[in-house]
From Swiss-Prot:
UniProt-listed Pfam families: DUF1508
Protein name: UPF0339 protein YegP
GO biological process, one term: double-strand break repair
InterPro entries, per database record: DUF1508 (IPR010879), UPF0339_domain (IPR051141), YegP-like_sf (IPR036913)
TM ranges: none
Keyword Cell cycle belongs to the record: no
Sequence repeat spans: 10-58, 61-109
Lineage: Bacteria, Pseudomonadati, Pseudomonadota, Gammaproteobacteria, Enterobacterales
Family to which this protein belongs: Belongs to the UPF0339 family. Duplicated subfamily.
Gene: yegP
Sorted UniProt keywords: Repeat
Length: 110
């Protein structure tokens, strides 16, 4: 099953999206947006940037866990991954975002 985006609205009227893999696991979480239109533009940015290896910033958190940020051409963070125990599992996460990030399916939960 192919992945999809889920768009949601927070209790303080901000918007965020997540990218889900085909198994339902969240593989990328966006920043908060002040408008639904901005969040939808963020989804479009994931679609265009996710296939490009150079858009992934690989990081190590202070607790030693591994994660990545997906960045746009202007170097703004579009979304961040979960924390991974190993660098290899982070690479698997990146591969999943590459495989699912071009999805045209958006589940609007706003």
């Amino acid at each position: 099953m192919a992945g999809w985006f889920e768009l949601s609205k927070s209790s303080d009227n901000q918007f965020r999206f997540v990218l889900k893999a085909g198994n339902g696991e969240t593989i990328l979480t966006s920043e908060l947006y002040t408008s639904k239109t901005s969040a939808e533009k963020g989804i479009a940015s994931v679609r265009s940037n996710s296939p490009q290896e150079e858009r992934y910033e690989k990081k190590t958190a202070s607790n030693g866990k591994f994660y990545f940020n997906l960045k746009a051409a202007n170097h703004q963070i579009i979304g961040s991954s979960q924390m991974y125990a190993t660098a290899q599992s982070r690479e698997t996460g990146i591969a999943s975002v590459k495989a699912n990030g071009t999805s045209q399916t958006v589940k609007d939960n706003t």
